């Protein structure tokens, strides 16, 4: 008897529920697609491409729509002899400067054995190398910069590339930039010259509502799961949870996928609403754990100080209670402590991530107003993460509780 056999009850093609799956059609984004197509039309006409800026929360279709439309654009422009279209797609998640973006663009355009070092060049020299590569390719070149908000305020490249031809750096290439951002504030913080250049065309992707998410799930389920594995109530619940929380198709698909995994693990043939609730809880726990692990060193120190107070049953706690512990733990870990106000910012970050609950108290003229903090997640979850903080000298009351 085989140890492993194929799934014949839940998943027909589970890859269709994964983040990297690209559907053949796009659901519930008709207006955005129409606007996007109009912005791309000059390319079909053989004209200089427009620069396009897409923004909206994670999971609302920005990248999926871009991949879908640009694939169609490449196919449809093949029939025109005077249009030579090239695409270069760069995810900027781990890039924090124009210099790093330029280096990575050069290395995407060059053969693997001819790539440049990520350090050691003046920025203008890297830009010049990039222009040489673009001119060597020639024709219309769309540079898609996904997660572009990660470069922060160092946005010079977002002006340099669109203006390279008019400034005499390019003669054979007609570049256009498509910037994709999850951060609503990124556009507002761009320098005026970059804003005027990059935001030539702006497209806002709003969160999905429950009916839209339901339509997306129904379309995916047709190929991803067996007919009897999931019913309308389960799909509607996944859509409703995601719509009320983030409006993200990615979240709705993740909940459905995790629900299927739970059912499969339990040896059950159908998904139930109970599976959906379990899936939501598991995904939220995973997200919280990831958020805690990704904190800065001082975020970790603030987390440990709060955990000590919680174990000693001293929460909810004010900043005046947390700061002395934070300072002691930092000094014991050979880390220079922040001033109280900056440390308070890290508590606020923990609250924003849903790790801490924050409540404002107002005691009138005598006591003033202040915040109190306590954990919004289980201390066992926090302890599992803190246990891996090797560079922090944990207080005895914390160390004994989590070992």
From Swiss-Prot:
SUPFAM superfamilies found in the cross-reference section: P-loop containing nucleoside triphosphate hydrolases, Winged helix' DNA-binding domain
Gene3D superfamilies in alphabetical order: 1.10.8.60, P-loop containing nucleotide triphosphate hydrolases, Winged helix-like DNA-binding domain superfamily/Winged helix DNA-binding domain
UniProt xrefs under InterPro entries: AAA+_ATPase (IPR003593), AAA_22 (IPR049945), Cdc6_C (IPR015163), Cdc6_lid (IPR055237), ORC1/CDC6 (IPR050311), Orc1/Cdc6_arc (IPR014277), P-loop_NTPase (IPR027417), WH-like_DNA-bd_sf (IPR036388)
GO molecular function, one term: ATP binding
Biological processes per GO annotation: DNA replication
Record keywords: ATP-binding, DNA replication, Nucleotide-binding
Positions with a binding annotation for ATP: 60-64, 208, 220
HAMAP family: ORC1_type_DNA_replic_protein (MF_01407)
Function: Involved in regulation of DNA replication.
Similarity remark: Belongs to the CDC6/cdc18 family.
Family annotation (PANTHER family): CELL DIVISION CONTROL PROTEIN 6-RELATED (PTHR10763), ORC1-TYPE DNA REPLICATION PROTEIN (PTHR10763:SF22)
Protein name: ORC1-type DNA replication protein 7
